[in-house]
Structure formats: structure tokens, C-alpha cells
Amino acid sequence: MNKIKCSLVLLPVLVLLLNSCASVPAEIDASYHEEVFFKNAQEAMDANQYNVALYYYEVYLVRYPENHDKTIAAEYEKALIYYKTKDYDYSKALFEQVLDRYENSPFAIMFPERYKILSEKILLQIDEKLNPKKKNK
């Protein structure tokens, strides 16, 4: 079951990476400190190079799965990228996974509360976008 979830999460990321205009680094230096990933990802997001930002977050998640407070940050940022690119269905699924980690992870006590709060707020916005209320005339 987890392999299926993982595949469903990684497949759109791979498609986005392969189809995007900005090129991602062919290789990331093995000596990069954890903070470099977030710095580079944020710079890419500021430049609207979402595929590059996703790449840095994905590599971070593979290299540093034991740093739980930063892992939840990377997962949140990935969801935010899909929200910004208007892939509301997929971003909704990712934000729900972030919230699920707060509920079910044994490491949830280490997670900064802000990602939970922000995920809940953005999920409400996504629901409004996916299910717009009809205005009475």
C-alpha cells in the first residue's frame, strides 16, 4: 500500500521535472549541507522555477529522511508548489499527507506547528477553488 502511495506521489513529480523548461542540476554535490537544499529551492521558487525547487526538495527528502522537522517542511513546500501551479487535486492530496503525518507520525511532536496550520488553511482555499459556491441572484 505504501509503495502505491509513494508511486502516486513521485509519478507527477517526475512528469513535471521531465516536461519543464528550466533545467535541473544534473548532479547535486554530495557535500551540500541540508540548508543549501532549502536555500536553492527557495531561490528557484522566487524565480518561478518550480521544477528546480521540486528537484531540490525531492533530493533533500531522499538524502535526509531522518531530519523530521525539515522533512515536513520539504513535504509542505512540495504541496505548495503544486498549489501555485494550479494542480489543485494533487496539491490537495499532498497537503492531506502533510496533515496525516501530524496525526500519525511518531515524530509529530518534532514538527513545527506552522506547516499544519498553513496546510489546513490552503486546503480550505483548494476546496473553494474545486467546489465554488453558486451565488444566488
Task: Label each region the model flagged.
Residues 1-23:
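Sec-dependent bacterial lipoprotein signal peptides
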Residues 21-137:
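Acidic, polar-rich low-complexity tracts and alpha-helical solenoid repeat scaffolds
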